[in-house]
Amino acid sequence: MLVTTTERIPGQEYEVLGECFGVTTQSRDIISNFGAGLKNLVGGEIKGYTKMLTTSRQEAIDRLKEEAAAMGADAVVMMRFDSGSIASDMQSVVAYGTAVKFIEKIRVRPLT
């Protein structure tokens, strides 16, 4: 399934099926929380959180593709992410976009 952040797919006509979403919520583990507390003191990347967000984004895209496929879509255009914290130890990531179905182009032979 093609997923793109652009509005158009060059050379492809399609009909819009509607909006589609992929959502995931992940909790931070105790070790990541402890490591984050230490990093707050000395600064630097919190690799446990980075890994969690990377995994969450991929899971959200996978779920977006599943929903689009269930709608009969061939692709998703204008894909975007949104994310936010829930309480102090959970992260929610949403991938959303527009599900589209390709329209077959009819090739007309020139008259001779």
UniProtKB/Swiss-Prot annotation:
InterPro entries noted in UniProt: UPF0145_dom_sf, UPF0145_YbjQ-like
Coiled coil segments of this chain: none
Domain of life: Bacteria
Similarity-based family: Belongs to the UPF0145 family.
The protein's name in its UniProt record: UPF0145 protein LAF_1635
Species of origin: Limosilactobacillus fermentum (strain NBRC 3956 / LMG 18251)
